[in-house]
Amino acid sequence: MKLNREDVLHIARLARLGLEEDEINRLSKELSALLEHFEVLQQVDTTGVEPTSQSTPVKSVLKEDIIKSSYAREDILSNAPRREGDYVRIRVVME
C-alpha cells in the first residue's frame, strides 16, 4: 500500500503532529514500506495455528508472600533525624 502526502498529513493531524515538508516525504516512504511488510505478513498461511497474544509461554512471575523478621520499629525510628510518634518526619517537599 502506498501512502500519499494527504494520507501522511491526515495521520499527522490525528496524532496532533506538525510535520515539515522533508518529514512528510520521508514518512510517506517509511510508512508505505511498513504497510508493505504487513501485506506480506497477511499472505502467510496460518491455517491450523491457534490465535494467541503471547508468543512465549506465560508463567507467573509473582511469588508467594513470605513473612520474615525485620528490624524493630524503635531501632529504625531511633536512626531517623526527626520523628513524630511512630513516623519519620520529613520536611515539606510540595505545598
UniProtKB/Swiss-Prot annotation:
It catalyses: L-glutamyl-tRNA(Gln) + L-glutamine + ATP + H2O = L-glutaminyl-tRNA(Gln) + L-glutamate + ADP + phosphate + H(+); L-aspartyl-tRNA(Asn) + L-glutamine + ATP + H2O = L-asparaginyl-tRNA(Asn) + L-glutamate + ADP + phosphate + 2 H(+). Pfam families: GatC (PF02686). Gene3D superfamilies: Glu-tRNAGln amidotransferase C subunit, N-terminal domain. One of its GO terms (biological process) is glutaminyl-tRNAGln biosynthesis via transamidation. Coiled coil: none annotated. GO terms for molecular function: asparaginyl-tRNA synthase (glutamine-hydrolyzing) activity; ATP binding; glutaminyl-tRNA synthase (glutamine-hydrolyzing) activity. Its EC number is 6.3.5.-. Keywords: ATP-binding, Ligase, Nucleotide-binding, Protein biosynthesis. Belongs to the GatC family. Heterotrimer of A, B and C subunits. Allows the formation of correctly charged Asn-tRNA(Asn) or Gln-tRNA(Gln) through the transamidation of misacylated Asp-tRNA(Asn) or Glu-tRNA(Gln) in organisms which lack either or both of asparaginyl-tRNA or glutaminyl-tRNA synthetases. The reaction takes place in the presence of glutamine and ATP through an activated phospho-Asp-tRNA(Asn) or phospho-Glu-tRNA(Gln). This is Aspartyl/glutamyl-tRNA(Asn/Gln) amidotransferase subunit C. It comes from Dehalococcoides mccartyi (strain CBDB1). The lineage of its organism: Bacteria, Bacillati, Chloroflexota, Dehalococcoidia, Dehalococcoidales.
